[in-house]
From Swiss-Prot:
Record flagged with keyword Ubl conjugation: yes
Subcellular location(s) per record: Golgi apparatus; Endoplasmic reticulum; Perikaryon; Cell projection, Dendrite
Protein name in the entry: UBX domain-containing protein 2A
Other notes: Acts as a tumor suppressor in cancer cells via stabilization of TP53 and subsequent promotion of TP53-mediated apoptosis. Acts as a tumor suppressor in colorectal cancer by repressing cell migration, growth, tumor dedifferentiation and cancer stem cell populations. May act as a biomarker of positive survival outcome in both colon and rectal adenocarcinoma patients.
Organism this protein belongs to: Homo sapiens
Amino acid sequence: MKDVDNLKSIKEEWVCETGSDNQPLGNNQQSNCEYFVDSLFEEAQKVSSKCVSPAEQKKQVDVNIKLWKNGFTVNDDFRSYSDGASQQFLNSIKKGELPSELQGIFDKEEVDVKVEDKKNEICLSTKPVFQPFSGQGHRLGSATPKIVSKAKNIEVENKNNLSAVPLNNLEPITNIQIWLANGKRIVQKFNITHRVSHIKDFIEKYQGSQRSPPFSLATALPVLRLLDETLTLEEADLQNAVIIQRLQKTASFRELSEH
């Protein structure tokens, strides 16, 4: 892969900022922003030449990055250019490396990062929605995810199972997106007073007779393991969150599955 020089002064070049969401940029800011996005997009094209041979190819998950005038999105999760974590994330992209944040989510399969240039447009939606990408882009390399995304439209199946969570209409309700280890997405309503353990119970009931190894839960982008299952969704700040099922491979499960 072609080596790419690091930015000499990332804070000086990272000028795609707005005083508040969706405010227009000044002429100087817009010019510098366009230069930065052009530079980043050009480097993404350069490093896209590295390919994986058919013998080495693994199952793939796509991550869609769009570079807007007022920030950038990762699978429609909006981020500011001025944030320190965002700067580190985009530095990795510019060097053709998979950001450590994505490495923490995907550790079994190949990640295909798509970079789209939308510097002349303002991103109006900042609602985080984790969804697959379909279309052309620039591959930055490979890594290993547990999630297998598909470019096809994903529809919610087994709707009868989705009614397993009792809701209190007198309390706030939130939508939780759940990505199962097999790549299937579920959207389920919960009260914010439900606990993390209720999400885990729901997944077990949803999968029903389909035997699966023990699993844990984590949020996506940024990665956060949900270790305390007694927390409510409000306490864990999981309103409208994206939850990932992460399988735990154990010998005891293999023994059980043989019976």
